[in-house]
């Protein structure tokens, strides 16, 4: 996969991290570190967290800063993003608490082509139809030159996909408490159109362990009602917030299991 972008070191609020796209990374940093879009009340001091769609690792780094005893299982299928994720974990001494896997999550194991955007790596997707629509909207709102700059140079790369429950059984066989799987305190899903497939890859034995879920969805995709129905069926209370920067486009679904 030929990609020319060289990761750039960024210093922000006592956090150093490498970024493939500085503008995109700063936007994501603001969402997570300033706007606290993933803050969940009442997490324990040592939460077990699944980061589906880890990108360059900003969410995992934020959670390790907030919860130093956290154990995080992070998934990132894009090779370039995974390499930068690994560098960022090492740079911030987070390797001991975060296990990063170079694969994506889905409802079934296999291999699929990922559309990778060098200038917007966080938008890389298994569902390119969604990004085609976003590109068309960017042309209308900002002009073709800007849209081409953001979405241009896309390449296809085959990536490995696994089911979350299969991975949990592999690393935490039999759900033994001494191996850290008494509970899954937070399942964060930000996978650019494949959110429902990720959730379908969780078996009932593991849904019973999940306390909180946060899912980002793109409204025009039409899958939000299906995601909410699945989570409600699993016993969660649902709330939904619109993204301030694009309230008619993106929603953040928060699902909490009541004790």
From Swiss-Prot:
Enzyme class name: transferase
Record-linked Gene3D superfamilies: Vaccinia Virus protein VP39
SUPFAM superfamilies: S-adenosyl-L-methionine-dependent methyltransferases (SSF53335)
Stated family: Belongs to the FkbM methyltransferase family.
Keyword Methyltransferase: yes
Functional pathway: Antibiotic biosynthesis
A single BP term in Gene Ontology: methylation
Name of the protein this chain belongs to: Methyltransferase sdnD
One of the record's GO molecular function terms: methyltransferase activity
Keyword terms: Antibiotic biosynthesis, Methyltransferase, Transferase
InterPro entries, A to Z: FkbM_mtfrase, SAM-dependent_MTase, SAM-dependent_MTases_sf
EC number from the UniProt entry: 2.1.1.-
Superkingdom of the organism of origin: Eukaryota
Gene that this sequence comes from: sdnD
Job description of the protein: Methyltransferase; part of the gene cluster that mediates the biosynthesis of sordarin and hypoxysordarin, glycoside antibiotics with a unique tetracyclic diterpene aglycone structure. First, the geranylgeranyl diphosphate synthase sdnC constructs GGDP from farnesyl diphosphate and isopentenyl diphosphate. The diterpene cyclase sdnA then catalyzes the cyclization of GGDP to afford cycloaraneosene.
């Amino acid at each position: 996969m030929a990609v020319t972008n060289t990761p750039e070191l960024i210093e922000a609020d006592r956090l150093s991290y490498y970024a493939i796209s500085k503008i995109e990374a700063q936007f994501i940093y603001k969402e997570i570190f300033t706007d606290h879009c993933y803050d969940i009340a009442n997490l324990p001091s040592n939460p077990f967290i699944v980061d589906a769609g880890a990108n360059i690792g900003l969410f995992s780094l934020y959670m390790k800063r907030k919860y130093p005893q956290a154990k995080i299982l992070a998934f990132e299928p894009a090779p370039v993003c995974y390499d930068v994720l690994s560098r960022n974990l090492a740079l911030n001494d987070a390797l001991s608490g975060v296990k990063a896997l170079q694969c994506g999550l889905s409802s079934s194991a296999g291999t699929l082509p990922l559309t990778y955007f060098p200038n917007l790596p966080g938008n890389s997707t298994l569902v390119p139809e969604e990004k085609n629509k976003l590109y068309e909207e960017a042309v209308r709102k900002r002009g073709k030159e800007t849209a081409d700059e953001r979405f241009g140079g896309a390449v296809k790369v085959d990536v490995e996909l696994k089911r979350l429950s299969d991975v949990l059984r592999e690393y935490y066989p039999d759900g033994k408490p001494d191996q850290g799987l008494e509970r899954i305190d937070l399942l964060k899903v930000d996978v650019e159109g494949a959110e429902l497939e990720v959730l379908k890859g969780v078996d009932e034995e593991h849904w019973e362990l999940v306390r909180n879920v946060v899912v980002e969805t793109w409204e025009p995709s039409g899958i939000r009602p299906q995601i909410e129905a699945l989570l409600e069926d699993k016993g969660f209370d649902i709330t939904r917030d619109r993204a301030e920067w694009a309230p008619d486009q993106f929603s953040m679904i928060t699902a909490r299991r009541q004790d």
